[in-house]
């Protein structure tokens, strides 16, 4: 029988790799908590109709990339390809009108059938932040600043913020009329994929990565030139407030987001730290999505960060594990029982305590403690068990023992004093 393997585009995250993941997630969640943003959790599996209505039938995500199947009840179900539509559905279903202003975050696996590459898998993990009910430019600026600060806190270098305005629905309709005329005249200059989009989702052509099409688009109408005075004012205010916060940005009038629901502010944060420019974070305003999905008219803005790419870019220092505080070496029936009881007591001090369960010789257990670079060890053998005491030994940064003490199992005061001086105060 052939060995079973994971599916292409999925990855096993092993303990050593997860050290960096957990450190990154810890920093991210601390930043979100400081900004008073609350978590929301939605199902991984949703009705397919949610994404058709929410993301847009003509998008690549819906037409090419979704994992969709019929369940036993003949219902069309889809593994979520992104989080915003699910959050919108959850808010509508659970009564958004009772709490119209919310700042929410989510984190979890998403699924898209794409070509796997570094930092992008078919099952990938995404952090999303959504500000629901907020219409002011200040909310746009705050969410951009939050994304910028999270990436900076993680030590990601060479960050670039690109911004654009997609205007409101009327602006886009006016642009689309002019753009469609241009597309019909210049159809032969476009790649086949873009030609197929002309009657389905013409705005997505602006985001084409095909060099032939990108060259042709240099002479196409620009959406920014069709913005109303009101939309221009909003965009100008956005730039002014980013300048006040000293967040550098580049205007990119060709920047459109890959999903249909965006309006007004669109932004991406990229980094060249991996050698070529890679998008780390993307977001924008989606004032029409919740109404489009059957809810009340509700403005909103959000962003998403792919965690796989974030892990690749985050600082090397986040790969360093926290060393074990105490490694308990034990041998003998009574000693093993005492060691287990002591390990539970020590963990109440918020220490990393590893109890050796191998039953190996003392020398092998000492080697394991040394390999883990444990800050200290406790030794309990037959003699210590008979005397109802244990040896605790502290190591310096070079791994040399520099303090040793014998403590009775019943002397909690002495144990706590030793821990405070040698481990808890570090």
From Swiss-Prot:
UniProt-listed InterPro entries: aa-tRNA-synth_II (IPR006195), aa-tRNA-synth_II/BPL/LPL (IPR045864), Anticodon-bd (IPR004154), Anticodon-bd_dom_sf (IPR036621), His-tRNA-ligase (IPR015807), HisRS-like_core (IPR041715), HisRS/HisZ (IPR004516)
Gene3D superfamilies in the record: Anticodon-binding domain (3.40.50.800), Bira Bifunctional Protein, Domain 2 (3.30.930.10)
GO cellular component assignments: cytoplasm
Localization: Cytoplasm
Domain of life: Bacteria
Entry keyword set: Aminoacyl-tRNA synthetase, ATP-binding, Cytoplasm, Ligase, Nucleotide-binding, Protein biosynthesis
Biological process, per Gene Ontology: histidyl-tRNA aminoacylation
Record-stated family: Belongs to the class-II aminoacyl-tRNA synthetase family.
Protein name stated in the entry: Histidine--tRNA ligase
